[in-house]
Amino acid sequence: ASASYLRARLLRKDYDGVKSFIPESVLTILLEEIQTGRAPCSLTALERPILAALRNLSPEELAKLPDVSEGLEYRIASAVRKTTSLDQLFAEIKTKRYTHARIRRIIVSAFLQMACDYNSPTPPYLRVLGWNDKGTEILRPARRTASLPIVMRGGDLKKLAEGALTIAQLGSRAEDLYSLSSPEIQPCGLDFTSSAARQRS
């Protein structure tokens, strides 16, 4: 099943409909997140803030977003003035050249105030989200020899060099805004305080 299919099921609270598609260990965590109000998250929950952010941007500012070229900024600016929902906005902007997924990425970039300056072919650091005993064997030597910093705890982000720290702060801001889309709004700064999840055998 696709991620879109699973998200749609979760938003409809059809939890039985996703059980057969995800591992039991993941399902346990997912149900805990749902119970605490941290899931499921939905872009629709951010509809008004996103539309507000877009209405404050000029075509010149839109042109600085990643993936915007060939005058697309004017098409976006025009669509923003005419539409009253994200679905309408995406439909108004979409063309054969600019797919729905690409348009959605651009709109989210605008909401996050993410300019082309942040576009880099290589990441400034590696973020470990979770690991098990086998992962420990790999990570221990890798942290000494890797060409990029390996981040396992939120506190590690504060030790990054200036350029990498800028990207980490952008990621943290995205996390803060993303948390507004959960059923229960979460506090800011979780990206700098959370740690990778460890699965013990």
Q: Which residues does each predicted region cover?
A:
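Active-site cores that bind ATP or allylic diphosphates and position pyrophosphate for catalysis
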Residues: 1-201
